[in-house]
């Protein structure tokens, strides 16, 4: 048995309303929280939203793996998500769920997924490995590998490898119910699908049900469809390789593919929602080229179907001062755009600009959004003081006692301010000119004629007639 889990962010008042939710940042840094048992507290009235986190609002969760199990023992309405029951205005990224969900005989309502109910949120680079099984018919239940019910949300770069056995109204490999302009972009599912019942529920390889303004683009389903317990009459109207059902007539489908299964369309109402392929073909380089040429972002996998790219984050560089020209940013030795899409890791950054010293530093990128913006304060090149130093050299060579007034020269020298940068070169040139002008304005003192006058006085005191030659 696992450890009974009380969810984070689960304070509920007497009216059943969540008073306190998690609104911070949680970075798992790649660690796994294992051996969790969600069974005991599932369905309790104090946990209408349930998971590792109960409800998150304006939160960021990343780098976390959840491992555990849930065997349903209560029949209350529960938004269950292994990572978060409900996510509002939040971002969940780079998380992995490996939690099994089993309901054999309880009449349940709500959700099961990595994130149960996503509202105005983004879920990206996440994976579900857990198997989900709901063996009993339900009235309101949404099962998805990544999101159960998505409302005004985006699910992108996610994968489901877990198997799904379902009799729920809306079940999908990635999202159970996609509604209110939500999007599924560049996701795939390889888990086995086992639909139950007579074909009165929606089950899709990517989404169970799609609604108004929703989009599914660049996705593929490459899992097995086990129809051994499905008693609907073909052609199947609510079972699809891409989407099971459509609740509104305005969804958008682009560049989607699904594995060929007899009598199973991409979507009964939108036959062109996806293109049928054999599983063998989907493992070839030709298929990789086909899906990527049309806009899909995948990596070729020689051992199977295409896989997702490594997580990338949009990293912005704020270079100051803002008025700099010819700014060039290099990341890892390569010229980069701004913002730049970077994988997690440490990079050497070099920034150059006109009249500035070259900036060099290392930056570390993680899922933490605080690492996605870097302010770089550039340092201007120093001003050229050559003319100032030359002028001061001239001053030092002078004997100030030879001049009537040396004050202006000394004032000009004392007015020199060191440490100016190249944008202040004009001021430095003015300092040099002030010194040169002061030197040019110097006036020598009058010569001392006292000895001359004394000698003349002696000469005038003589009687030249007393001398042979007074010339």
Regions found by a protein language model. Name each.
Residues 1-314:
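Surface-exposed repetitive/solenoidal architectures
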């Amino acid at each position: 048995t696992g450890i009974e889990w009380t969810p984070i962010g689960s304070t509920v008042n007497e009216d059943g309303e969540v008073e306190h939710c998690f609104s911070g940042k949680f970075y798992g840094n790649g660690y796994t929280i294992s051996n969790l048992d969600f069974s005991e507290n599932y369905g309790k009235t104090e946990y209408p939203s349930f998971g590792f986190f109960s409800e998150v609002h304006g939160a960021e969760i990343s780098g976390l793996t959840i491992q555990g199990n849930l065997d349903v023992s209560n029949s209350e309405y529960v938004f269950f998500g292994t990572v978060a029951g409900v996510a509002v205005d939040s971002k969940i990224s780079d998380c992995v769920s490996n939690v099994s969900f089993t309901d054999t005989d309880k009449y349940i309502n709500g959700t099961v997924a990595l994130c149960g109910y996503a509202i105005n949120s983004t879920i990206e680079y996440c994976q579900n490995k857990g198997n989900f099984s709901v063996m009993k018919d339900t009235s309101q239940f949404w099962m998805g590998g990544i999101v159960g019910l998505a409302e005004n949300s985006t699910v992108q770069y996610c994968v489901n490898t877990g198997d799904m056995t379902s009799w729920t109204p809306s079940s999908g490999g990635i999202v159970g119910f996609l509604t209110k302009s939500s999007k599924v972009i560049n996701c795939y599912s390889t888990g086995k699908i086992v639909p139950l019942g007579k074909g009165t529920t929606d089950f899709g390889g990517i989404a169970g049900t799609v609604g108004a303004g929703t989009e599914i683009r660049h996705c593929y389903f490459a899992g097995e469809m086990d129809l051994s317990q499905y008693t609907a009459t073909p052609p199947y109207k609510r079972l699809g390789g891409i989407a099971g059902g459509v609740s509104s007539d305005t969804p958008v489908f682009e560049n989607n593919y699904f594995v060929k299964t007899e009598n199973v369309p991409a979507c009964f109402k939108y036959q062109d929602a996806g293109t049928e392929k054999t599983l063998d073909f989907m493992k070839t380089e030709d298929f990789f080229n086909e899906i990527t040429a049309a806009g899909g972002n995948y990596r070729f996998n020689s051992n199977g179907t295409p896989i997702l790219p490594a997580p990338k984050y949009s990293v912005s560089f704020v270079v100051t001062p803002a008025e700099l020209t010819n700014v060039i940013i290099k990341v890892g030795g390569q010229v980069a755009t701004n913002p730049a899409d970077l994988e997690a890791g440490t990079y050497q950054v070099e920034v150059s600009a006109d009249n500035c010293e070259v900036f060099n530093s290392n930056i570390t990128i993680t899922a933490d959004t605080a690492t996605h913006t870097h302010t770089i304060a550039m340092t201007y090149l120093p001003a050229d003081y050559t003319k100032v130093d030359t002028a001061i050299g001239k001053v030092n060579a002078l004997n100030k006692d030879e001049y009537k007034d040396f004050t202006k020269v000394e004032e000009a020298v004392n007015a020199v301010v060191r440490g100016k940068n190249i944008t202040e070169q004009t001021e430095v040139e003015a300092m040099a000119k002030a010194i040169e002008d002061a030197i040019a304005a110097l006036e020598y003192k009058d010569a001392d004629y006292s000895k001359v006058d004394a000698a003349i006085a002696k000469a005038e005191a003589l009687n030249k007639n007393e001398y042979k030659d007074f010339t």
